[in-house]
């Protein structure tokens, strides 16, 4: 799928070269109650720097992926891993999310995102909001989709990108041609 999605390599390298903290997805079996969560969940784990990023092996889609044997050596944004680290007091500033398609809802003013169907990002955002939502001074995470311009549908034929009650609307979407589409509705505090 690398040729069918926006590549994040330059974004990751630039952020790391500027000294930013960069977290990438790590999928794993969950220890959470199976009645309240999927069998596998996504956490965000920190990259240690450019050399660490370059050492990551690529998965079957060509995406650099964390070796499960190194997860306990890494900071996890939600904490609570096997190493028992606490979450950051501040949390994440921005999350870039993939999607199959995006559009604009004329009624609500939201950008709608059609994910890949597993709910990994939506469930992570829900867990993140529970962990950070009541922290004093916490600024809600900005959620932006990342897409090719062809993935942003203008007046889709069937009228709408399908979304469910658990789908988190992004604040906007950044397109491969440099265009940024913003939601105009106030998204509830996460």
Segments predicted by a language model, with ranges:
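N-terminal active-site beta-alpha-beta segment that forms phosphate/nucleotide-binding
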Residues: 1-87
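Surface-exposed, charge/polar-rich loops and edge strands
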Residues: 50, 62-95, 99-116, 122-190
């Amino acid at each position: 799928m690398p040729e069918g999605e926006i590549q994040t390599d330059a974004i990751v390298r630039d952020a790391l070269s500027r000294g930013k903290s960069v977290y990438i997805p790590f999928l794993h079996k969950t220890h959470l109650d199976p009645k309240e969560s999927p069998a596998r969940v996504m956490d965000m784990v920190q990259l240690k720097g450019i050399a660490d990023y370059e050492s990551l092996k690529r998965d079957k889609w060509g995406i650099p992926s964390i070796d499960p044997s190194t997860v306990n050596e890494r900071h996890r944004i939600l904490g609570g891993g096997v190493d028992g680290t606490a979450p950051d007091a501040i949390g994440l500033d921005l999350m870039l999310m993939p999607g199959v398609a995006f559009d604009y809802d004329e009624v609500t003013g939201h950008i709608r995102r059609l994910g890949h169907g597993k709910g990994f990002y939506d469930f992570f955002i829900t867990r993140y909001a529970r962990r950070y939502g009541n922290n004093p001074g916490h600024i809600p995470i900005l959620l932006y989709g990342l897409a090719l311009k062809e993935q942003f549908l203008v007046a889709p034929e069937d009228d709408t990108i399908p979304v469910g009650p658990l789908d988190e609307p992004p604040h906007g979407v950044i397109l491969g041609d440099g265009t940024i589409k913003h939601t105009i509705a106030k998204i509830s505090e996460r």
